[in-house]
Design a protein with these regions (language model features):
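Interdomain hinge/linker segments and adjacent boundary elements that couple functional modules
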Residues: 2-7, 11-17, 21, 25, ...
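Short Asp/Glu-rich motifs
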Residues: 42, 83, 216
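C-terminal regulatory/effector modules of DNA-binding transcriptional regulators
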Residues: 182-283
């Protein structure tokens, strides 16, 4: 396991679902299991809802005993629990992240992101981020912590252990036209986008003014495709919160909307050419 705790969030997510399936297979209610183990009411429900930080191995073994799980499956689930117990870096940023967003982003095999007015966080330079934050109402200490977390998030694009996700980002021409910082700052941001667009795991697409209003999406959307066939998750961003969307119908709707937004945007090669031309204008 890499030092960014790759796989810990997915392991915890999968373990929660498997425990729920096992309990339902025994016909026990969650409260009945709590009573059998002398646990407080609600503990099993929290486990199954993935509302835990790190599963305790003794708790997992107690549940597997109650559910009469065979040796092979028990070993598999205990291995999941061990991986789920890894402490990821974002646990130190609970003041910045209120949910599992950074964990699923960290573990995703594919990330699709659409931002109508700003550049996605994974693509931002430090100067761009600081310029955006200066216009907000967050205190300086929070902004510094948020920048630290943003830089840690971006490290997933540089992993060399085979776990680097594929990133598809649809950005708008508007996000590139705002005046912020100095011309040098803006040039560095565009140069950074050019460099990213040339990576084999990054696909950038621009929605231009000339092509009409954005098609398909109008809010900040992140779609995380998870490993081993897990259902994709969607996170919606606002200035003050990141909301998870997990229902199958809603997730599928956002995936379809993203496809329309992507199809109405410049192809990746044309996007790179556009960005190079924009960088030249900022010389």
């Amino acid at each position: 396991m890499s030092d960014d705790a790759y796989g810990a969030t997915i392991a915890k997510y999968r373990l929660a679902r498997r425990l729920a399936e096992l309990r339902r297979g025994t016909q026990h209610t969650a409260n009945h299991v709590c009573d059998m183990l002398n646990w407080g009411r609600g503990k099993v429900g929290r486990f199954e809802a993935n509302q835990w930080k790190r599963p305790e191995m003794s708790d997992i073994r107690d549940l597997l005993r109650i559910y009469d799980v065979g040796a092979a499956e028990r070993d598999e689930l205990e291995d999941l629990a061990v991986r789920a117990r890894a402490r990821p870096w974002w646990r130190d940023y609970a003041d910045i992240f209120e949910n599992e967003f950074p964990g699923f982003e960290n573990d995703a095999v594919r990330i699709r992101v659409f931002m109508p007015l700003l550049l996605p966080g994974l693509l931002q330079t430090t100067d761009y981020f600081e310029a955006v934050m200066r216009h907000g109402s967050r205190p300086p200490a929070w902004r510094r912590r948020s920048l630290e977390a943003r830089l840690r998030r971006q490290e997933i694009l540089d992993r060399s252990d085979g776990s680097t996700p594929v990133l598809t980002a649809v950005i708008t021409e508007a996000s590139l036209m705002y005046r912020w910082g100095t011309k040098v700052d803006r040039r560095e941001q565009v140069d950074h986008l050019v460099e990213l667009s040339r990576r084999p795991n990054v696909e950038l697409r621009i929605q231009r003014f000339a092509d009409g209003p954005p098609v398909g999406m109008h809010s900040m959307v992140n779609i995380f495709d998870l490993p081993q066939g897990e259902q994709s998750l969607v996170y919606l961003e606002t200035d003050y919160a990141i909301e998870e969307v997990s229902s199958t119908d809603s997730v599928n709707s956002y995936i379809q909307s993203f496809a329309r937004a992507s199809d109405s945007s410049l192809e990746p090669a044309d996007t790179t050419a556009y960005l190079i031309q924009l960088a030249e204008q900022l010389e």
